[in-house]
């Protein structure tokens, strides 16, 4: 596979994630956009690791580390959102000021 194609794909994923994170008013949509951004970054790590130095697995190992952190975020994020919804009755970003009671 050509390096430019993979870089365009990963930048497209990252750009969709940034756009979704900036324009979303819903916290669940923001978490999904964050996952898209992390997947774009992981695709870059794996591509550069394979393309430039295929014997050393530094990019692959770092990508696995980022996937583990994304899995923890995907497990803890909805729990935090359900707690916020129980207290505030809304999961909209602009309505949930967590510093006020």
Curated annotation (Swiss-Prot):
Q: Which gene encodes it?
A: ndhE
UniProt keyword annotation of NAD present: yes
Which GO-annotated molecular functions does the record name?
oxidoreductase activity, acting on NAD(P)H, quinone or similar compound as acceptor; quinone binding
Record localization: Plastid, Chloroplast thylakoid membrane
Q: What family does this chain come from, according to its entry? A: Belongs to the complex I subunit 4L family.
Quaternary structure note: NDH is composed of at least 16 different subunits, 5 of which are encoded in the nucleus.
Sorted alphabetically, the Gene Ontology cellular component annotations on this record are:
chloroplast thylakoid membrane; NADH dehydrogenase complex
| UniProt entry keywords in alphabetical sequence | Chloroplast, Membrane, NAD, NADP, Plastid, Plastoquinone, Quinone, Thylakoid, Translocase, Transmembrane, Transmembrane helix, Transport
What species was this sequence derived from?
A: Pelargonium hortorum (Common geranium)
Q: Which reaction does it catalyse?
A: a plastoquinone + NADH + (n+1) H(+)(in) = a plastoquinol + NAD(+) + n H(+)(out); a plastoquinone + NADPH + (n+1) H(+)(in) = a plastoquinol + NADP(+) + n H(+)(out)
The broad enzyme category this protein falls into is: translocase
InterPro entries, A to Z: NADH_UbQ_OxRdtase_chain4L/K (IPR001133), NUOK/Mnh_C1-like (IPR039428)
Q: What protein name is recorded for this chain?
A: NAD(P)H-quinone oxidoreductase subunit 4L, chloroplastic
Transmembrane domains' residue ranges: 2-22, 61-81
> According to Swiss-Prot or TrEMBL, what is its membrane topology?
Multi-pass membrane protein
């Amino acid at each position: 596979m050509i390096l430019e194609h993979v870089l365009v794909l990963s930048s497209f994923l990252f750009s969709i994630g940034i756009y979704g994170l900036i324009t979303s008013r819903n916290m669940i949509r923001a978490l999904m956009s964050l996952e898209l951004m992390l997947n774009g970054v992981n695709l870059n790590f794996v591509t550069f690791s394979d393309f430039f130095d295929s014997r050393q697995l530094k990019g692959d190992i770092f990508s696995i580390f980022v996937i583990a952190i994304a899995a923890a975020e995907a497990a803890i994020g909805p729990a935090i959102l359900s707690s916020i919804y129980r207290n505030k009755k809304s999961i909209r970003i602009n309505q949930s000021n967590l510093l006020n009671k």
